[in-house]
């Protein structure tokens, strides 16, 4: 059994690693952490690359890729200590995709995919 990443997955990993290393040098991460903020310009840049919608179906504005590609991005974001709303958005999107009604998916997943909407998972 072969567990190597595909060429496309390796390209996603390489691109993410390079971009995040450039964007989130340790001084910048500290500055953002001390201010209790995230880098909105970096978030918009990742949105333009389609990262928030990597797992969302193309019919709803996403890239229609899979969980492996999503996890590759999460791993690189974690490695870079990137203070961004990516994880919460992805979690909300995954829950909506798995358990949401068609109406909920159509209402929220395009915004999550574009980065216009920000979500999180809550339990009562």
Regions found by a protein language model. Name each.
Residues 1-8:
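Intrinsic disorder at enzyme termini
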